[in-house]
Structures are given as C-alpha cells and as structure tokens.
Amino acid sequence: MKSRVLLDSSVWIEWLTKGKRLSACQKYMDKSLIIGVPSIVVFEVCRKVQMKVSEDEALRVAAWLRTFGVLTFNDELALYAVDLSINFKLGMADSIVLAHAYREDAQLVTLENDFSSLKNVAVIRS
C-alpha cells in the first residue's frame, strides 16, 4: 500500500512552474495519496503566483488546491508546531507544515533540505 503524503509548498510550486525537479515530484502528485493542503501552503503558493503572474492566476491556483482539501490550522496544532519548531530549529511555516504531516501520519514531501534529517520526510533532490 502506498503511503499518504503531504506536499510542501516547494513541491506545488515546482509542479506549477514545471521546474527541473518536476519528474521527481510527479510520483507524489497522485490525488488519492495527498491528504490535503495546509492553509499556510495555500498562502505560500498563491503569494508566489500572485507576485510572479497575477491575482487572477493565484485565485485559479487556490481553487485547484482546494480540490485536494484544505487542512486548517488551530490552537492545538499551533502548540504542536511550537514544539517542532524549537526541537528541530524550524521556522514558523515549516513547523506548521510538519505538524500537519505528523498529525495525519503522512510523509512530508519537500524540496527543502531543512527537513532532510527528520523522520517520515522525503526530500526531492533531483
């Protein structure tokens, strides 16, 4: 059985921009495996799209991301993210994304090396 995954904003951006690591990302883009998109990932991806392309395109991307289900952020998850941030020396957004993945028992998939030493994380390098 394939494992459930949570994609970091870096993977969504790589997918949308058809970046050089797109082929390595594709195996994780199976909608049946993706547990949802954290609301902070929607923010990060749409901010990038709006800055680089347009607000209209960012709204289209947000609508598409919603089809995967948006994972909301609450106080319980915030406190869990605080612990992860302190223990692993992660920034706010990274610790929130990791908290979502860990809470849902999903593998975090990312392009960011900051996560490389953490359990249940796949860092796409090529």
Label each residue range with its predicted role.
Residues M1-V37, Q50-R60:
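Short, well-structured N-terminal submotif of metal-dependent ribonuclease cores
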Residues S3, S32-I35, T67-G69, R103-Q107:
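Short active-site oxyanion
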Residues V70-L111:
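Active-site neighborhoods of divalent-metal-dependent phosphate/nucleic-acid chemistry enzymes
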Residues L22, V42, A58-V61, N74, ...:
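A general structural signal for well-ordered alpha-helical segments in protein cores
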Residues K2, L98-S126:
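Acidic, PIN/NYN-like endoribonuclease modules and their adjacent C-terminal/linker elements
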Residues W12-I13, V42, A78, F115-S116:
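A generic structural signal for short hydrophobic patches within well-formed alpha-helices
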Residues L7-D8, G36-S39, L90-G91, E112, ...:
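Histidine- and aromatic-rich ligand-binding microenvironments
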